[in-house]
Amino acid sequence: LPICPSGSVNCQVSLGELFDRAVKLSHYIHFLSSEMFNEFDERYAQGRGFITKAVNGCHNASLTTPEDKEQAQQIHHEDLLNLVLGVLRSWNDPLLHLVTEVQRIKEAPDTILWKAVEIEEQNKRLLEGMEKIVGRVQPGDTGNEVYSRWSGLPSLQLADEDSRLFAFYNLLHCGRRDSHKIDNYLKLLKCRLIHDSNC
C-alpha cells in the first residue's frame, strides 16, 4: 500500500481510504489463494484423500480466531485488529518458503508459481497497511503480540512425494481459509470503525 509519494511531507491519507485499500487487497489475496488451492487440488491431490487429513492442521491453530461473523462481532475492534496482524505475520515465513519450494514440484505450472509470488508480495503490502491502520486506531501499539511460528519447511522438502504434496496441500488449504477470515474481519472492522456499524 504505497500511501504517499516518496519524499512527500505531511501526507495524510484518511483511515477510510486505508481501510478501502486493505479490504481490496485482502479480497485479491483471498481470490488468488482460492485459485491456487483449486489448481493444486485438481492437479496433484485427486484421489489421494488429502482433504480428510487436512482438517485442523494449520500452523497457526494456536491463534484463536472467530469462526463466523457473529463471533467476530463479539470481539472488541482493538483485539480484532491485533488478531489480523497476528494472522498476517504468521504467514510471512510460510509464504516465503512456498515461493522457493513450489518451484521444485514436478511439472509445477507457472500459474501456481506466479500466484505464490504474488500472494507473498501482497501479504507484505497488506501487513504494512494494517500496521498503519493499527497505528491510527491505537497510537503507540503496533500489535507486537506473539504470533505462531512456522516449522513446516522440512515437510515441504520430504523425499516421499505423497507426504510432500500433502504438506503443500495443507499449507494452501490453510492459506485459503485464513485469507477468507482476514477478508471478512477487515470488512467488519471497516463497517464498525468507518461507517459506525451502519452497513
From Swiss-Prot:
It is found in: Secreted. Glycosylated. GO terms for cellular component: extracellular space. GO terms for biological process: positive regulation of cell population proliferation; positive regulation of receptor signaling pathway via JAK-STAT; response to nutrient levels. Its main location: secreted. Disulfide bonds join C4-C11, C58-C174, C191-C199. Glycans are attached at N60. It comes from the Eukaryota. InterPro entries: 4_helix_cytokine-like_core, Somatotropin/Prolactin, Somatotropin_CS. Keywords: Disulfide bond, Glycoprotein, Hormone, Secreted. GO terms for molecular function: hormone activity. Belongs to the somatotropin/prolactin family. This is Prolactin-1. It comes from Alligator mississippiensis (American alligator).
